């Protein structure tokens, strides 16, 4: 199993469908920087009640170097990329397209919310994908219906 750094978008997507626990089931350990914590705790995040937020506190890990990437990506994403390098993580869990492309250009292996859910499905940790995808669509998460339906068809589930 591997270590992962998690960005806000992935935590929001998993929290929305009550699947934060998948992080502990798929990865040896996971962490996120203080900027991600600030984003989660300071803004309205459906799916994140106090209990879920409190359970995540033990995964906060501050960065120790200057955040030189905040000029080219959001603060939480930039701290996540920096933390990835500082603790020599195996994966960066991130959804934002631009930030993901920058991270990949730095040689970082990225997985998004969809990838985590698909890993969980393959391991038998998730029975059905369609209820998860429906919630994401209803909540305006940044996934296209076309792509989600292609995934559902691949796993022999009805499109949404």
Mark where each language-model region is.
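Generic anion/oxyanion-binding catalytic loop in active/binding sites
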Residues: 12, 118, 137
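Active-site-proximal, substrate-binding regions of enzyme catalytic domains
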Residues: 2-89, 97-100, 106-108, 131, ...
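Long, charge-dense
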Residues: 113-121, 125
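Short beta-strand and adjacent tight-turn residues that come in two discontinuous sequence segments
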Residues: 94
